């Protein structure tokens, strides 16, 4: 993949990630002034995950690092705009949720219950379930870690 193709794919990924970020921000009743920042943060998070995945990291670690970046930027923006960090961060990480792997795991579980046990279906179920669980765990933990680091009152040592 050439540089131009990569940059076009990255721009497309970031633009398409901004749409669900704004949509969920509207569902969560985020103030209108913060909608553009939710879109930008969702784009930054999804774009950084794509860059990390393109550089060779797997989706779990890429999501871990991208959501850490989203949490850190969200805390900084919350100080600038005098809002709670979750105003920016929760809607921004929604585009990184593992819909396809969770859906594939669910379909595999339904097929196992209908057709009976088979090893390929069980492998598909476990692989996709563990991938989805790891991604959701990374997203939930990494939204809280920057707050614990940056708002800590006592010394770290």
Swiss-Prot record:
Transmembrane domains' residue ranges: 15-35, 50-70, 87-107, 121-141
Gene Ontology process terms (BP): succinate transport
Identification of the protein by name: Probable succinate transporter subunit YjjB
Top-level taxon in the UniProt lineage: Bacteria
Signal sequence, start to end: none
One Pfam family per UniProt: ThrE_2
Subcellular location, record wording: Cell inner membrane
UniProt topology in membrane: Multi-pass membrane protein
GO cellular component: plasma membrane
Assembly information from the UniProt record: The transporter is composed of YjjB and YjjP.
Role noted for this protein: Involved in succinate export with YjjP. Both proteins are required for export.
This protein's UniProt keywords: Cell inner membrane, Cell membrane, Membrane, Transmembrane, Transmembrane helix, Transport
UniProt similarity note: Belongs to the ThrE exporter (TC 2.A.79) family.
